[in-house]
Each structure stands twice: as structure tokens, then as C-alpha cells.
Design a protein with these regions (language model features):
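Short, acidic, Ser/Thr-enriched surface-loop or helix-capping motifs
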Residues: 1
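Compact, glycine-rich, soluble single-domain proteins
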Residues: 11-26
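Active-site- and interface-proximal helix/loop "cap" or "latch" segments in soluble metabolic
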Residues: 24-26, 30-38
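C-terminal binding/interaction regions
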Residues: 36-106
Length: 106
């Protein structure tokens, strides 16, 4: 967050799949509830069936949700398998030509 604080979130599965929430949106919602409004970076750790074979990337809904809280050129998305094995991309790379709050003012 722009404040330097770190917020964590977890994936919450539900028998009614649309009701579940991804860890990214969970963490951001927690941050917003605490007064935060600008994301500078988000780290995502995980993998299918708790496997560390693949990097875990945010789904499309989470990419758009992250986009609502900052400039996609300035938001760093960190994909981590471990403390030493990770990669970084900008949100702009993950969500090119995105629609955001400024789009509503045009």
C-alpha cells in the first residue's frame, strides 16, 4: 500500500462458487476497510493444490479489482513460489488497455 503497510488475505472457497473470494480481493478489501486507497504492489503466493511448481497469477476479476486502486504502470505484481523464487510484472503488463476510474470521467 502507499502507506507502507502490508495486508494479507486468503482464498475463501464456498459450496456456491460465485460466493467465494480470491485472496487478492480479500487483502485489498481489508486494506480499504483500514482506510487505504492506493496499491503500489501486491504479492501472490500459491499454486494449484498447494503446489509450488507454478507461479500463481491473479484471475481476471482480481486484475480489474487491483486496477481500481492505482495506476497500472506503477503497480508491481509479485508472483512467488518461495522467498527466493519469484518474478515481477507491472499490472499494465497483466491487464493491458485497462478500464479504470478515469475511464468513467471521459
Amino acid at each position: 500500500m502507499d502507506s507502507g503497510k502490508i495486508y494479507s488475505g486468503t482464498n475463501v472457497e464456498n459450496a456456491s462458487y460465485p460466493v467465494g473470494i480470491c485472496a487478492e480481493r480479500n487483502a485489498i478489501s481489508h486494506a480499504v476497510a483500514c482506510g487505504e486507497r492506493k496499491i503500489i504492489a501486491i504479492a501472490i503466493v500459491g499454486g494449484a493444490n498447494y503446489s509450488h511448481n507454478d507461479f500463481c497469477a491473479p484471475c481476471g476479476m482480481c486484475r480489474q479489482f487491483i486496477r481500481e486502486f492505482g495506476n497500472p504502470k506503477e503497480i508491481t505484481v509479485i508472483f512467488a513460489k518461495s522467498v527466493t523464487e519469484f518474478k515481477e510484472m507491472s499490472l499494465e503488463e497483466l491487464l493491458p488497455e485497462s478500464f479504470g476510474p478515469a475511464s468513467l470521467k471521459q
